[in-house]
Design a protein with these regions (language model features):
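N-terminal Rossmann-fold NAD(P) dinucleotide-binding loop
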Residues: 156-157
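Rossmann-like adenosine-cofactor binding region
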Residues: 43-46, 56-64, 176-272
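Phosphate-binding beta-alpha-beta segment of Rossmann-like dinucleotide-binding domains, i.e.
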Residues: 92-94, 98-146, 150, 161, ...
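Rossmann-like dinucleotide-binding domain for NAD(H)/NADP(H)
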Residues: 96, 228-317
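An N-terminal-biased, well-structured beta-alpha scaffold segment characteristic
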Residues: 1-97, 218, 224
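Glycine-rich Rossmann-fold phosphate-binding loop(s) that bind the pyrophosphate
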Residues: 10, 152-153
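Redox-cofactor binding/interface segments in oxidoreductases and associated redox assembly factors
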Residues: 50-53, 76, 204-205, 233, ...
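Short, conserved active-site loop motifs that form the nucleotide-linked donor/cofactor pocket
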Residues: 26, 94, 187-188, 278-279
Length: 317
């Protein structure tokens, strides 16, 4: 019997285009629609030996893994995944592997949102196409404005470099950030999270999700921001209190927000984030680029080959 491989959340239908799966002695079955319910997942994946999953969209708790008797290998894009129960996988003889992931696409996505907000691109384009007013917004200048970064890691530091190229004043804060590290990137270390929020014209989130960062930006923090300031989150949804952000947008306490990550993905129809005012929202596109997908799926093929040869690579955790 040939092995079967499920490729989850292949929304664009490109998984089999960007990598050569033909060299595998495996039947590859892409799933175009997201499966949220655990019972539905158990039913859909019950006769698969291998599952390829994107990011952290589909949790694999022990309760699901135990219901997949044929499952032997999970390949997750990226080298960090907090929604897979590794102990349960080990107990059931399931190997878990990851892939490389480029920091370039999320940096570019961050700037797409910042520029879109600053120049009212979506609003002006929609007005032009729909016969609306000719020029209805007044763009926010980037040159001379302050960009505040929550997090100065691999992605945050590259976002900072672009901000500096635009002539922005760039500040950064995280609990572990030192003045020396900030200076090495060419940015200022903010005195505190509160100071960064209060004095920045654009605030962009670039932190890993953990217990200390979960809910880091809530109603009190949003209240510190200028009414002319914008918040951008391309990192992890749970870092920003979504309800508090919705309230801030509705109350006009901030000028707007750019959001690429959500508490529930894909967003259900009728979800308030789909219709919030002054929100530039995108369906988690930060990692979605042809180059990144070629890496994800190309290395997924390599991982499957290595596993079948008895020498797994890029094992997690």
């Amino acid at each position: 019997m040939r092995l079967r491989c499920a490729v989850l959340d292949d929304f664009q239908g490109v998984a089999t285009e960007v990598a050569d799966w033909s060299r595998l002695p495996v039947d590859v079955v892409p799933f175009r629609e997201h499966i949220r319910d655990e019972d539905a997942l158990a039913a859909a994946l019950g006769d698969f030996d291998i599952v390829v999953t994107l990011r952290e969209r589909v949790p694999f708790p022990g309760s699901l893994i135990s219901r997949l008797p044929r499952l032997k290998l999970i390949v997750a894009s990226g080298m960090r995944n907090s929604v897979i129960d590794y102990e349960a996988a080990k107990a059931h003889g399931v190997t878990v592997c990851g892939t490389a992931s480029s920091s370039t696409p999320p940096v570019e996505m961050t700037w797409a949102l910042i520029l879109g907000l600053a120049r009212g691109v979506v609003q002006e384009s929609n007005a032009l196409r729909q016969g609306g007013p000719w020029q209805s917004t007044l763009g926010a200048d980037l040159h001379g404005a302050r960009l505040g970064l929550l997090g100065l890691g691999k992605i945050g530091s590259r976002v900072a470099q672009v901000g500096l190229a635009f002539g922005m004043r760039v500040g950064a804060w995280s609990r572990n950030l030192t003045a020396e590290r900030a200076a090495a990137t060419g940015v200022e270390l903010a005195a505190s999270k509160e100071e960064l929020l209060a004095d920045s014209d654009f605030v962009s989130v670039h932190l890993a999700l953990g217990e200390r960062s979960r809910g880091l930006i809530g109603a009190p923090e949003l209240a510190l921001m200028k009414p002319t300031a914008y918040l951008v989150n391309t990192s992890r949804a749970a870092i920003v209190d979504q309800d508090a952000l919705l309230a801030a947008l509705r109350n006009r306490s901030i000028a707007g927000a750019g959001v690429d990550v959500f508490d529930v993905e894909p967003l259900p129809a009728g979800h308030p984030m789909r219709s919030a005012p002054r929100l530039l929202a995108t369906p988690h596109l930060g990692y979605v680029s042809r180059g990144n997908y070629a890496t994800y799926y190309g290395q997924a093929v390599e991982n499957i080959e290595a596993y079948l040869a008895g020498s797994p690579v890029r094992q997690l955790p």
